[in-house]
Amino acid sequence: MLNLDKPLYTIGITAEILATHTRTLMMYEHLGLVVPSRTATNRRLYSQRDIITLGAIQRLTRGYGLNLVSARYLILCLQLLDAHGIPRPAGLTEIDVEHVKV
């Protein structure tokens, strides 16, 4: 079974996976959208859950034109709808937020 919270990926690898810049990841960290683990030498290590979370945020900001605060809020709303078995609004059914942590 895959441990989604195990820190595995450096900031460079994470940026490459997400097709973004390391500075963008640092900004997301500064805003509290994701908090990577740190090594003994203070290097950032991202988990698979961090990458899933960042990918969901990117889909909402790039694909739907939301700002970062709105993307975070929408993820929380979708998680609440899913947790209570309430159908999602049309157009938001394909966004997977099951393993996202915001």
List each language-model region with its residue ranges.
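Arg/Lys-rich, alpha-helical DNA-contact motif
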Residues: 2-16, 26, 30, 35-36, ...
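Short coil turns linking two alpha-helices in DNA-binding domains
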Residues: 21-23
